[in-house]
């Protein structure tokens, strides 16, 4: 099964690392990156994900996974990484 991954990024180091990881996964068939101030505003980011949200935010398929920590936990849970 292949999935689409979406990352909401501000270009920081954590976003770049998550981008590299998601692009390397064979389960990800399509990768989309949305950048703050290019594809959305910072206000729209916090309106969507909450005032405490951090960059990056990740969605896989139709499911919003969350922050880098939540995404790593999810990927381990589905055995995409060890």
What do these predicted regions represent?
Residues 60-82:
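Non-catalytic, surface beta->alpha helical segment in thiol-disulfide oxidoreductase systems
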Residues 9-10, 36, 62:
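Conserved residues at beta->alpha junctions
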Residues 1-30:
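Local sequence-structure signature of Cys/Sec-based thiol-disulfide redox active-site neighborhoods
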Residues 49-59, 68-69:
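Structural micro-motif
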Residues 31-33, 64:
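Conserved beta-strand scaffold positions in the cores of enzyme catalytic domains, especially
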Residues 34-52:
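Thioredoxin-like thiol-disulfide oxidoreductase module
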């Amino acid at each position: 099964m292949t999935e689409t991954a979406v990352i909401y990024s501000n270009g920081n180091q954590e976003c770049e690392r998550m981008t590299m990881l998601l692009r390397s996964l064979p389960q990800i068939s399509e990768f989309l990156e949305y950048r703050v101030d290019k594809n959305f505003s910072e206000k729209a980011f916090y309106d969507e994900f909450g005032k405490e949200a951090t960059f990056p935010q990740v969605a896989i398929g139709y499911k919003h996974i969350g922050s880098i920590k939540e995404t790593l936990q999810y990927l381990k849970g589905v055995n995409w990484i060890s």
